[in-house]
């Protein structure tokens, strides 16, 4: 048999084997091999054996790591090949110019570092190029995502910051944060992020917050209401102008991990450790649990309501002849779970599709503003893009988005353009009729991710 090793390599291998046998108390085998190879005690003494000790194990583990890396690269190559196979020159050109078809590139524009612990949450300012991140280091950091620079660090919470969100009345945008210290805090970006109010009331960690939208146009507008979700199993609705809790909603039987309001502020979608997704109707005096969706096999980490732009694609999954009216809300929704799956639901609580592909907990998801795609991130360190037009097929996987678990994902809200004037209305601030068209919203092709690796990454066109 012809050896593929050089004489020098063969000698090194023999010495490593003898050292391995000696270190594992197989002295007779080591002596027999030394004798057969002609390695006398003066040639292969104790010092030499010590030098080669552990070499076999190191080589073995290196091979295992290389095999895993090869498998990961093959998987990524297959995903890229699949994406290429599904693309045409026209679709590729369109993706580069049409914001409704934009998907993030594999490499981020910026990788921002300053936090000293896990980043749990991120939120974009609805107008400016600011983004906030909250961390287990108990701080909130404000960054300029266009320049990739840290603007300021906010220190006030005494426990990990679990969620952040921008919103509030037009002309009075606020930043809200919530924490394991049981409080919600409001910050004024126009006054150097001064803490203007602290909202106590929850009896356990406050895990999620969102400003309640005030219109169904899809614009980045919200009013004075804020909703929070907590480990105390309640949802609370707050008036940020007074700091009062207006409603407490009960129904979940375990930790509520996420909450998502509809564009018109009429509905809330919530989910958590009771493995249910619940839709609440806020249009009545006492909020009603309109739907309870059951299907996941583990805790549910995240949920989202689909924008009207997704209705044409999701209605086909639902078997509808035509999509619901764009003015309706809460027609379709998605949930991501520790069972590694994403589920799509309709307004009747029917499970439309289970998206399988992640290899670990699904931590966050967001619908593409263009409507065709759903994006998700996971503890498997990937970002996946699911094409709703192709029956929810995963058409793009970005591997190693972070070095460790990916914890959060947000899409920059669209920029509200000037509202169109109509024959019976004006665009100078005078009252308009209710039939007026909604203002146009320009999609910003910017997303951000945060991770246990303490890095905030910006993906932009």
From Swiss-Prot:
* PROSITE patterns named among the record's database cross-references: LISH, WD_REPEATS_1, WD_REPEATS_2, WD_REPEATS_REGION
Q: Which Gene3D superfamilies match?
A: 1.20.960.30, YVTN repeat-like/Quinoprotein amine dehydrogenase (2.130.10.10)
The record's listing under SUPFAM superfamilies reads: Lissencephaly-1 protein (Lis-1, PAF-AH alpha) N-terminal domain, WD40 repeat-like
Q: Which UniProt keywords apply?
A: Cell cycle, Cell division, Coiled coil, Cytoplasm, Cytoskeleton, Microtubule, Mitosis, Repeat, Transport, WD repeat
Annotated coiled-coil segments of the chain:
61-88
UniProt KW Ribosomal protein keyword: no
| Gene Ontology molecular-function annotations | dynein complex binding
Under the heading Pfam families, the entry gives: LisH_PAC1, WD40
Record InterPro entries: Dynein_regulator_LIS1 (IPR017252), G-protein_beta_WD-40_rep (IPR020472), LIS1_N (IPR037190), LisH (IPR006594), PAC1-like_LisH-like_dom (IPR056795), WD40/YVTN_repeat-like_dom_sf (IPR015943), WD40_repeat_CS (IPR019775), WD40_repeat_dom_sf (IPR036322)
Spans of the WD repeats? 114-155, 157-197, 201-248, 251-290, 295-355, 357-396, 401-444, 446-461
TM segments?
none
This protein's record includes keyword Cell cycle: yes
Q: How does it assemble?
A: Self-associates. Interacts with NDL1 and dynein.
Q: What is known of its domains?
A: Dimerization mediated by the LisH domain may be required to activate dynein.
| UniProt record similarity statement | Belongs to the WD repeat LIS1/nudF family.
Function summary: Positively regulates the activity of the minus-end directed microtubule motor protein dynein. May enhance dynein-mediated microtubule sliding by targeting dynein to the microtubule plus end. Required for nuclear migration during vegetative growth as well as development. Required for retrograde early endosome (EE) transport from the hyphal tip. Required for localization of dynein to the mitotic spindle poles. Recruits additional proteins to the dynein complex at SPBs.
The protein's name in its UniProt record: Nuclear distribution protein PAC1
Q: Which organism is it from?
A: Pyricularia oryzae (strain 70-15 / ATCC MYA-4617 / FGSC 8958)
**GN (gene name):** PAC1
